[in-house]
């Protein structure tokens, strides 16, 4: 028998809640869905991913760090051999959050930024978003997080 018995990665829109209003948002994020999974239900999903042998989950949204239980879900996932990748606008990564993220195993972060300049980025993502994303990257670097990714949407 050859091949994989489970997907390598599963993408999970953890929340639709978002503090930005990006012009290009694919999920029409903004407000939290009232039917959003509870923490315990999220743990159940992770249990199933572990049972199936999924290598990692890509948490998106919305802004996944808006969930009050975000760190609980990430910890539960990595404690159950399900690695985590997540995309963030960076606004919730302060020095403390960066240190907490740097202390975790099996974690990959992608910070979204949409322009080489503040003017270009903020036109797409909203005022102050460029500075927030840059600050998040600085906090991650200062916390010795290691390599992280930067996601850029390019348009003509």
Label each region the model flagged.
Residues 12, 59-60:
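Catalytic metal- and UDP-sugar-binding loop of GT-A-like glycosyltransferases, i.e.
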Residues 3-40:
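Canonical Radical SAM [4Fe-4S] cluster-binding loop centered on the CxxxCxxC motif
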Residues 36-59, 67-156:
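Radical SAM/AdoMet-radical enzyme domain recognition
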């Amino acid at each position: 028998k050859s091949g994989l018995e489970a997907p390598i990665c599963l993408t999970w829109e953890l929340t639709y809640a978002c503090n930005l209003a990006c012009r290009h948002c694919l999920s029409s994020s903004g407000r939290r869905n009232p039917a959003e999974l509870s923490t315990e239900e999220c743990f159940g999903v992770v249990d199933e991913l572990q049972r199936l042998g999924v290598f990692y989950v890509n948490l998106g949204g919305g802004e996944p760090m808006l969930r009050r239980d975000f760190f609980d879900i990430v910890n539960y996932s990595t404690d159950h051999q399900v690695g985590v990748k997540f995309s963030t606008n960076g606004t919730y990564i302060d020095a403390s959050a960066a240190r907490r993220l740097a202390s975790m195993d099996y974690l990959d972060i992608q910070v979204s930024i949409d322009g080489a300049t503040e003017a270009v980025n903020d036109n797409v993502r909203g005022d102050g978003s460029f500075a927030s994303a840059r600050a998040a990257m600085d906090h991650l670097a200062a916390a010795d997080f290691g390599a992280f990714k930067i996601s850029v949407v390019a348009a003509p």
